[in-house]
Amino acid sequence: MIKSDIASTVPIIAIDAMGGDVGLDTTLAAVLSVKNQYPALKLILVGNQSIIEKHSLFPQIASQMEIVHAEQIVAMDESPSSVLRHKNDSSMWRALELVQQGKADACVSAGNTGALMGCARFILKMLPNISRPAICSTVPNRYGHVHWLDLGANVSAKPEQLKQFAIMGSELSKAVDNIASPTVGLLNVGSEAIKGNDIVKEANTLISATDLNYVGYVEGNDLFLRKDLNVVVCDGFVGNVALKTVEGIAKFIQYGMEAEFKRSFFSRLTALVALPALKRLKKRIDPRMYNGATLLGLQGLVIKSHGNADPIAFANAINLARLEVENNVLHRICEQLQLNPEHDQ
């Protein structure tokens, strides 16, 4: 449901209570945390009502919570086609239906990414003039953070689709970062004009012709070291591989530091001295604080939480949905698409 102006009422967010690897323990703890922070926010739990009501945390939120019953659960390894055929009474499906029916402003799910994308496209449909959806996530860098898309919705993308991603990413940054004119970069193998394949070169031409604050080609290291960068655009194959590489390197460094600090008495002493700085660094790059990827390009707001998110991480995904509803991201994107009409898709 696309609203025509900035939301004037309290956001209503549908929560897929049964999705993800950890289930209700995480979901209800996160909901309790968010409700304590934003008491007026309306959250709808979607899932097996009997199981939800029997959970030990439910009495603490029962008076503030609506439950929409759904009999089925989407497994994390279930194929999108199987879910579309057989799981139309699942918590994921029913949560998306609430958005489609205008009974909720956004849906948050920690469920199967492929199934969520497939169901969202089927139930909510694509925005006018958007041919492909994109997964947009926020990653920390030296100067704050950057919004990065596409991170896996499409293994390839046409130049026109990369332009669409740039428009959607820019509007998302305006909404959640409160930046009037976010900078947008196109991920490439080099910053020189001669670098890149034909798709990237044509996308560069198309994005340059828009009214976006486009800074041209950017390289992988720019995501973390460049100050004047708010949005980075690429196809889903490149984005997903790059993101998982970064996540792997981060874990490698973490494990390596832990091993070295435990190696001897002196290294333990060094760790003790460095502990305050290490805690600050850990908090700054804590992936839980950036949990929640937006499925852009749909006629409804959908936030994908990490499947193994803890309560802190899942609460941040809910808060991202709240922020996007309050700033009417969908309407902003639609307005920009009208200012930058499509050519061949």
Curated annotation (Swiss-Prot):
Its EC number is 2.3.1.274. This is Phosphate acyltransferase. GO terms for cellular component: cytoplasm. Keywords: Cytoplasm, Lipid biosynthesis, Lipid metabolism, Phospholipid biosynthesis, Phospholipid metabolism, Transferase. It is an enzyme of class 2 (transferase). GO terms for molecular function: phosphate:acyl-[acyl carrier protein] acyltransferase activity. It is found in: Cytoplasm. Belongs to the PlsX family. One of its GO terms (biological process) is fatty acid biosynthetic process. Its main location: cytoplasm. Catalyzes the reversible formation of acyl-phosphate (acyl-PO(4)) from acyl-[acyl-carrier-protein] (acyl-ACP). This enzyme utilizes acyl-ACP as fatty acyl donor, but not acyl-CoA. Pathway: Lipid metabolism; phospholipid metabolism. It comes from Dichelobacter nodosus (strain VCS1703A). It catalyses: a fatty acyl-[ACP] + phosphate = an acyl phosphate + holo-[ACP]. It holds the Pfam family FA_synthesis. Coiled coil: none annotated. Homodimer. Probably interacts with PlsY. InterPro entries: FA_synthesis, Phospholipid_synth_PlsX-like. Signal peptide: none annotated.
